[in-house]
């Protein structure tokens, strides 16, 4: 199947391209850049071709600066946008990136009307809403990377703390991809044992030293921490994107936490895009999976909805003047 990446010369776009090129389900990978970055885009394809040959991988690689070449794509990944700096809040990007995402969403709807759109551009929850409205697609076919990467980060930190394999940690982060993210600690388990039991029994000596508040702060600040040291996040987002894309192409029906339009499924929240667990299959989102939250988690989730909704309304009002629907 064909997958297109818009913004393929950016650091996340490049890393994502290499990840997806190695996936058997991806038969054609089309990399789209701005016209002024076309030479770099060509170079990326040539370099990637050599790498894939060394691994014995055969995939058709294409590149262009023309958005109409998304035609025939099963999935279009939008990574294009102004990158975030370490001292910049994701919401600071909203107005600039809103214009970029809105324009691309319109063109995707025109040239690839049957495709699925995966939004990566930050602030991802707001940009997912923008892409949804400007594409006119059904919500099942437009969603964002959301809290999938945040969930993986939390799993990783907890696995390292308790010295267990990451697959033994079952946890999830929902809400906003940002300060209002909600780690669902109340339903977290390690090796099938609810984490709350670790406080009552000596399963692992590390439990009493586990600082939940610091761990949550670590997840929230993970992106900024990486950006301040190397200038951008690349590999984490790329592999998380690859998880989502291959889940769809292989019709795996996995439950992943992505940013999607809320329509009352959780706590009656509507008309805002938030990270929640969904079942993903070949046609996109097959349904939102209900979650159990304690009182504090529910309160933070509602705060996330309020914050993201306010940010989204401001961006949509701005876009209504710049790019009327």
From Swiss-Prot:
Report the NCBIfam families cross-referenced here: PRK06223.1
Q: Which PANTHER family match?
A: L-2-HYDROXYCARBOXYLATE DEHYDROGENASE (NAD(P)(+)) (PTHR43128), L-LACTATE DEHYDROGENASE (PTHR43128:SF16)
Specify the enzyme's EC class, one word: oxidoreductase
Quote the EC number: 1.1.1.299
What keywords are assigned to this protein? NAD, NADP, Oxidoreductase, Tricarboxylic acid cycle
GO terms for molecular function, please? L-lactate dehydrogenase activity; L-malate dehydrogenase (NAD+) activity; L-malate dehydrogenase (NADP+) activity
The record's listing under Gene3D superfamilies reads: Lactate dehydrogenase/glycoside hydrolase, family 4, C-terminal, NAD(P)-binding Rossmann-like Domain
Q: Which family does it belong to?
A: Belongs to the LDH/MDH superfamily.
Instruction: Check the record and name the InterPro entries matching this protein.
Output: L-lactate/malate_DH (IPR001557), Lactate/malate_DH_C (IPR022383), Lactate/malate_DH_N (IPR001236), Lactate_DH/Glyco_Ohase_4_C (IPR015955), NAD(P)-bd_dom_sf (IPR036291)
Provide the catalytic activity annotation.
Answer: (S)-malate + NADP(+) = oxaloacetate + NADPH + H(+); (S)-malate + NAD(+) = oxaloacetate + NADH + H(+)
Q: What does this protein do?
A: Catalyzes the reversible oxidation of malate to oxaloacetate. Can use NAD(+) and NADP(+) with similar specific activity.
Pfam families the record matches: Ldh_1_C, Ldh_1_N
A GO BP entry: lactate metabolic process
Q: Give the organism, scientific name.
A: Methanothermobacter marburgensis (strain ATCC BAA-927 / DSM 2133 / JCM 14651 / NBRC 100331 / OCM 82 / Marburg) (Methanobacterium thermoautotrophicum)
Question: Which residues are responsible for catalysis?
Answer: 177
Name of this chain's protein: Malate dehydrogenase
Q: Which residues bind substrate?
A: 84, 90, 122, 153
Disulfide bridge partners, by residue number: none
> Which residue stretches, if any, does this entry annotate as coiled coil?
none
Give the residues the record marks as binding NADP(+). Answer: 7-13, 97, 120-122
């Amino acid at each position: 199947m064909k997958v297109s990446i818009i913004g393929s010369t950016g650091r996340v776009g490049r890393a994502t391209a290499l990840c997806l090129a190695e996936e058997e389900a991806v038969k054609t990978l089309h990399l789209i850049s701005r016209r002024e970055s076309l030479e770099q885009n060509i170079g990326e394809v040539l370099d990637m071709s050599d790498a894939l040959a060394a691994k014995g991988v055969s995939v058709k690689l294409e590149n262009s600066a023309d958005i109409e070449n998304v035609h025939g794509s099963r999935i279009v990944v939008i990574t294009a946008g102004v990158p975030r700096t370490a001292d910049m809040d994701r919401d600071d990007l909203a107005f600039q990136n809103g214009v970029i995402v809105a324009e691309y969403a319109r063109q995707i709807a025109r040239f690839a009307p049957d495709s699925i759109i995966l939004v990566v551009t930050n602030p991802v929850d707001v940009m997912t809403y923008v892409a949804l409205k400007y594409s006119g697609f059904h919500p099942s076919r437009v969603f964002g990377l959301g809290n999938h990467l945040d969930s993986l980060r939390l799993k990783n930190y907890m696995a390292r703390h308790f010295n267990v394999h990451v697959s033994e940690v079952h946890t999830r982060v929902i809400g906003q991809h940002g300060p209002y993210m909600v780690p669902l600690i109340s339903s977290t388990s390690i090796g099938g044992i609810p984490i709350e039991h670790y406080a009552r029994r000596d399963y692992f000596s590390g439990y009493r030293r586990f600082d939940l508040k610091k761990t949550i702060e670590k997840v929230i600040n993970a992106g900024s921490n990486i950006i301040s040291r190397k200038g951008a996040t690349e590999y984490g987002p790329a592999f998380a994107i690859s998880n989502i894309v291959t889940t769809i192409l292989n019709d795996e029906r996995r439950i992943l936490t992505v940013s999607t339009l809320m329509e009352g499924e959780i706590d009656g929240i509507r008309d805002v895009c938030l990270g929640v667990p969904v079942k993903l299959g070949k046609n996109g989102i097959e349904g939102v999976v209900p979650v159990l939250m304690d009182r504090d988690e529910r309160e933070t989730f509602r705060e996330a909805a309020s914050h993201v909704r306010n940010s989204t309304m401001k961006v949509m009002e701005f876009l209504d003047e710049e790019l009327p629907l």
